Amino acid sequence: MPEIYGPQPLKPLNTVMRHGFEEQYQSDQLLQSLANDFIFYFDDKRHKTNGNPIPEEDKQRDVNRYYQPITDWKIMKDRQKTVSAALLLCLNLGVDPPDVMKTHPCARVEAWVDPLNFQDSKKAIEQIGKNLQAQYETLSLRTRYKQSLDPCVEDVKRFCNSLRRTSKEDRILFHYNGHGVPKPTKSGEIWVFNRGYTQYIPVSLYDLQTWLGAPCIFVYDCNSAENILINFQKFVQKRIKDDEEGNHDVAAPSPTSAYQDCFQLASCTSDELLLMSPELPADLFSCCLTCPIEISIRIFLMQSPLKDSKYKIFFENSTSNQPFGDSKNSFKSKIPNVNIPGMLSDRRTPLGELNWIFTAITDTIAWTSLPRPLFKKLFRHDLMIAALFRNFLLAKRIMPWYNCHPVSDPELPDSITTHPMWKSWDLAMDEVLTKIVIDLKNAPPATALESQMILQQQETLQNGGSSKSNAQDTKAGSIQTQSRFAVANLSTMSLVNNPALQSRKSISLQSSQQQLQQQQQQQQQFTGFFEQNLTAFELWLKYASNVRHPPEQLPIVLQVLLSQVHRIRALVLLSRFLDLGPWAVYLSLSIGIFPYVLKLLQSPAPELKPILVFIWARIMSIDYKNTQSELIKEKGYMYFVTVLVPDWGVNGMSATNGSAMINSGNPLTMTASQNINGPSSRYYERQQGNRTSNLGHNNLPFYHSNDTTDEQKAMAVFVLASFVRNFPLGQKNCFSLELVNKLCFYIDNSEIPLLRQWCVILLGLLFADNPLNRFVCMNTGAVEILLKSLKDPVPEVRTASIFALKHFISGFQDAEVILRLQQEFEEQYQQLHSQLQHLQNQSHLQQQQSQQQQQHLEQQQMKIEKQIRHCQVMQNQLEVIDLRKLKRQEIGNLISILPLINDGSSLVRKELVVYFSHIVSRYSNFFIVVVFNDLLEEIKLLEKSDINTRNTSDKYSVSQGSIFYTVWKSLLILAEDPFLENKELSKQVIDYILLELSAHKELGGPFAVMEKFLLKRSSKAHQTGKFGFNSSQVQFVKSSLRSFSPNERVDNNAFKKEQQQHDPKISHPMRTSLAKLFQSLGFSESNSDSDTQSSNTSMKSHTSKKGPSGLYLLNGNNNIYPTAETPRFRKHTEPLQLPLNSSFLDYSREYFQEPQMKKQEADEPGSVEYNARLWRRNRNETIIQETQGEKKLSIYGNWSKKLISLNNKSQPKLMKFAQFEDQLITADDRSTITVFDWEKGKTLSKFSNGTPFGTKVTDLKLINEDDSALLLTGSSDGVIKIYRDYQDVDTFKIVSAWRGLTDMLLTPRSTGLLTEWLQIRGSLLTTGDVKVIRVWDAHTETVEVDIPAKTSSLITSLTADQLAGNIFVAGFADGSLRVYDRRLDPRDSMIRRWRAGNDKQGVWINNVHLQRGGYRELVSGATNGVVELWDIRSEDPVESFVDQNVTSQYGSQQKPTTMTCMQVHEHAPIIATGTKQIKIWTTSGDLLNSFKNSHNNGVTSTLAATGIPKSLSYSSTSDAFLSSMAFHPHRMMIAATNSHDSIVNIYKCEDERIDYF
């Protein structure tokens, strides 16, 4: 037997897909994309930030430690230098001081010289002085060293005074060795000799300060050295106190403040004596400071547990060839005899590599142990200070083993002694010594390489003044004198070209055999230190970088940049580190990375370009001001120009620069001939292979390619834009026709929006404040390219175009600028011409020069000739500049920009307001006249009682029709922009014009009279109870904007008082009067958005200042609830000033501060956002699967079971169920949005849409429902707003807002704005009481197409195919339906027209809906109750039925009722109609359920304010019509509400069948 569902068997349901849409389900590609592709809209950064940069306050708070700014990272060029050094040696060899009892044997070696090897003590101390000076010269050769050997007091005074006179204000090094005199006194006095060396004479520390002046660095190598340090500080404090009391020491050569900039290094504390171990030097402290590698090796071997086994070979011959004395002494067997081959300055040798490693390790220890300011002060300001303190760290580690504890001022922490990096230093020494042991045991007695190294050492050691007898003494200690630049060339300040290094490097390149040997040595690594630390750094980047703590390997990575072997790998890792955010960039800059990457810009190696461009983009993104002047030097900016224009200056410059770089000898340069297929290149390829494919725009390519991607070009353009920003010298050097043409090419042809955006910005910056560059760009067509980019599909590019064209606005000083440029180019031409003549003369005189020199001269000439031609071209351009032509172009630009006031992106419109502010500022006098005439015309209209009877022959003002009048009207439109920030900015521009008008000499008086007249008229209208907005005002507003708010809402007393404290428009009396003036004209000074922005937490109601008392309740409660906050927007509180400052450039450069090499947080597996998104996706799939079985239930179930009733507090006009959240969203006629949780029965949020009085919300849609949904509202004034986090009133924000329709007609029968959102295509269909259906593209935020409706009837309903998005259907007030296909030409897009409602007159379409799922039924419902199902392939309905129109009994008459609403379930074959009952139908026309939506709750709450008695209220509403209904998209649920009722009832279909078996 057939199954019975109702009172009779149901008609068969449709089982065929309608409209031929079955083809969509047969497309595997489409179904796969629907299942896997989740495209989210209005989710870009501009929607979350409103196009504003992060406020400085947030950066200072830095809650997430993302910035950690270090603003003083740059090492200034005028930093202090140690220019002179005093080496004061008080040894008195052969005589021990009386206060110290020395052991026997005891330490006696000074500066690696044993005095017992000399018969004459004078020669011994001279040799000690020479050696000590040579050791210091390894730290800094540029310092002038002077020795004072066993001096008397007079010599010391004369010596110190002379040094201060020659040093002026620079630093002096004072090294004091007091091994031959008593230890310093408790008061800090040091001892010297009298002239006869018969007495020890104390020298007051205060006198020493006076003689030496300041600043100084003091090294005390003596017993109880801390006594000097402590008393030095006391004397400095005494000088400061004396200065404060007015007793300045006039004998002091330096200001007292300079003494605070002194540094001190002392060998031991005040109660300690220096070590006396005979196996160690007596001046162990000085050895640690001046030759750390040698002393480290010796002490490492002496303390090694392997000295009797592995390292025994170093102790076997310790009794022979030792620098100190008699071989019979037993302690000599404890002293190792080791000679590390190589040179300190040559990092390719074992000794050089050890020195290099030591520099990296000590830098790391200091950087991780010291506060950042102290680290910078000690290690990044002075070469000598950095070297001494770096080596002092070694002293702090070694000397405590021998009961000496070095101290310093400033004091360094004791944690340095046990820092973990010292183990790395021990490991590095062990690796080198192990290889030496292997070579000594296995290698022949003397290899060719060793012989060459020995020869190099001997050549370096040879001095004219050294005797043959002393060669043996200095052999083991000769490491210290092998290179005078050892430590200096490894410091971060040593990147200048060193002549000695250059000469040695040029000699080494003379023969091809030596070059081959050099390359072989270059690849050889004696330790794995750097490679291991790079691996450690890579692991830190992979696993620990999210903690945002400084990695200890960063200083080591800095040192690795000096190595050509590991340079590319180090740069890649460094770029990955910089990609972590601004905090990483600041850290890198503070450690000293900048000089290195600046020097690398001179490298011609093509494989470095992508990495360097990326690194420089990161640096410029956080601090471009401190880098601009540096890029001028050596034309570093040209590196980025050649990335964009690879063939720039090929004939003239590249050959010259290339040869210069190859021969420069700088350790940071990399020649193009380098083997790029070496291990580093292969490593990077492995890195590329392991990296995921979607890393962002800044992926680094394989470096064997010379080409750069558009993303990398965008970074180069950004660097140039930052270089020329507010930097005229940079603009002058960077501007060239080649660059301009290439930028235009990229704007026209690149598919990467980022490149187009920054090319547009750079073009604008290149001609900013420069009429010559503007004229050149105009003549070359660059301006036309910018105008074309105003229609770019990407909002950021459109905004950039407005930003660039803003700089084309002429300045007041253009004529003076042209005159100055003429003078500059004339001077430049004369200089270049003289240089060219000099080169030509030089070429004629030197006929016998080499071919290379001849080529070099020719290249120089070609370069200068090219510069001369460029100079002549610019001079010619200056002569033909036509300022009037520039003005015409400027007006043309303005005309082209004006249509953007209707752009869908608030970012574009905000920049447009800024552009208008520049126009107003430049032509303020014109705008004063325009506004005055406009107000005058308005007063004339107000004087006419009937606008229709006014004299039509009245002439319009001369300002009407001008471009400035159009801009004024545009500003009025933008003053009512739906986006709050744009609105406030526009008001500032309008206020500025009115303030200028009020202060005008001639028009200020008449304007004041006009103001009084309007205010008086407004007050009279208020007293008579007339609403202050008449037809003449409508006429005034109509030409600019139809939806100006007619009322001015003010706050209650408490809120008004708060506003007066914060709002300058209220606190300024002139601005207050101007506000009243606008109120008198019917303009609202602020609409609901701005009124409630600051009162969201209190939710205080706003009342109307204007309007009669009868409208008070209606007007006052219009926006009682809070409005959404605008991201990163704060109201203007500063004095009004034009032009407005654009934040777009700072906002855009934040892109290069954000991580680009890794996935976004939401796409990273395991992240909170990823897990939340995955959970939502699984939940959505679960809901869809669970509700599939409910389709059958919808046919036989009971729909009249009420699930819950929700009180909206006002009558809901619109309702919308969320697909997957348990949310029901309602909107009433006062634009109040309410979000309910229907499962829990509570209100989640309640807020105002912020629409002006007289308008209401007419549509609700949800966007991105597959994830975190956004709420879209459409209001009757054509405004569309999109909200994020709408379910939480504390965090919800407005994402975007714009006018979907600009010519809406507000009539009593108008349905307002109707929308249809197509998630699959990102399209928003908008229509209403207009003659078009406008299609907005969410990707581009522009109008995609306007499709004519082909009728003058009002559109009442709109629906579209949600799967493909090509077909949409509109229902009209004349009862017709029209089908459109957007794939066709707009003129031919209407493909079908139907007449619904049985073709009766006076019937209009309530609703038309195309199912999202099911069999895609297209259902229409008319007001006469006719429900029809359509197939777009058919001209007639495929099914039709009529709601029986339940009649109402009034006496003996029966009147038919009207079907007020109709809804279709998205997936089930169910239709609901609403009259005074809810009826549930099948799509075949069978009635399943019929029930009333009646209740007793909520009625009186709605009508109590009207004063209607409760009995009458109930009787009038118990039989009320349904106001609105809404099906749940998936569940079998329906929400319904009655007219004049605040209660929303939700019904759920339930299975009530009884199973008897």
From Swiss-Prot:
Pfam families: HEAT, Raptor_N. Keywords: Cell membrane, Membrane, Repeat, Vacuole, WD repeat. Gene3D superfamilies: Leucine-rich Repeat Variant (1.25.10.10), YVTN repeat-like/Quinoprotein amine dehydrogenase (2.130.10.10). It is found in: Cell membrane; Vacuole membrane. The keyword Membrane applies. Belongs to the WD repeat RAPTOR family. Component of TORC1, which regulates multiple cellular processes to control cell growth in response to environmental signals. Nutrient limitation and environmental stress signals cause inactivation of TORC1. Active TORC1 positively controls ribosome biogenesis via control of rRNA, ribosomal protein and tRNA gene expression, and rRNA processing. TORC1 positively controls protein biosynthesis by regulation of mRNA stability, translation initiation factor activity, and high-affinity amino acid permeases that serve to provide amino acids for use by the translation machinery. This is Target of rapamycin complex 1 subunit KOG1. It comes from Saccharomyces cerevisiae (strain ATCC 204508 / S288c) (Baker's yeast).
